[in-house]
Amino acid sequence: MEVFSVFATLSLVDMISGPLDRVRRAMRSVEGGVATLGQRMGNLALAMAPVALAAGVMLGAFGMAASKAMAFESAMADVAKVVNFETQSEFQAMNKTVMDMAGRIPMAADGIAAIIAAAGQSGVAKQDLAEFAEQAAKMGVAFDLTGDQAGKMMSDWRAGMNLTLPQVYSLADAVNHLSNNMNATAPALGEVIQRVGAVAMVCGLSETKVAALGAAFLSAGASPEVAATALKSFTTTLVKGTAMSKNQAAAFRSLGFSATQMAKDMQRDAQGTIFKVLQALADKPKELQMSLLTEMFGQESLGAIAPLLKNMGNLSQ
């Protein structure tokens, strides 16, 4: 019985083996086809990769261009709000001017448009806007400022200090020169002038001398806020005249200065007067210098003013 079972099993295996072989051959054929198809699909994917990459780059470029166009359109809309363009063609001409300028100056068109908006809002005449924008854009590039920042800074100088456009451009050149030759960055110095330039000019300084004195205070390591406070305190003290306190007047008399005469001298030769006062302080014994400075200009300005006594050369930049 067992022998019969074995032979029966072997016979059954023989009967099944043929069909199974055919099935296996068919499966191998399918597997080969699938492998070939997979290989072909892989090759196709490899071939299409550069195309997909190029398409992605193109879509990104189109998206970026669209974004820039929208930013420019928005910026020019702001210009139209503050500048009275009499005709649409006049507005389009300004658009072209801005685009041309963006091709010559490394600043985006919407940044230049922001400068024009700031200038228009501050009262720069329409016929002067293009020149103002070009000068401010160049300043912005040199000072590492955005169009918004450059436009506001230059507009604030002009309006606050009552400067002509040539004076504004000359001031920008002076700030650039000072920042290249002293320990004072152009943005920080520009901010100091924005804060207290008008006050310092009333005290007798020209716009470029305001910049020089501001740079001298900054070079001692003062922040723009501290330097601006020191500049305001220093210059207004020298022109107080009869409004000077008794203790202040006594401190100046100990240096050989009359409060009323000093106020007059500031209007004639502010830079020379400032230099004489600081030189007189520097000539005093060191143990007296800080008490005199505190009495004359106040505690909050010491950090910016005191270092000048050791480096008077900063005042002649």
Regions found by a protein language model. Give the residues of each.
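Extended alpha-helical or coil "stalk/linker/tether" regions that are enriched in polar/charged
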Residues: 212-317
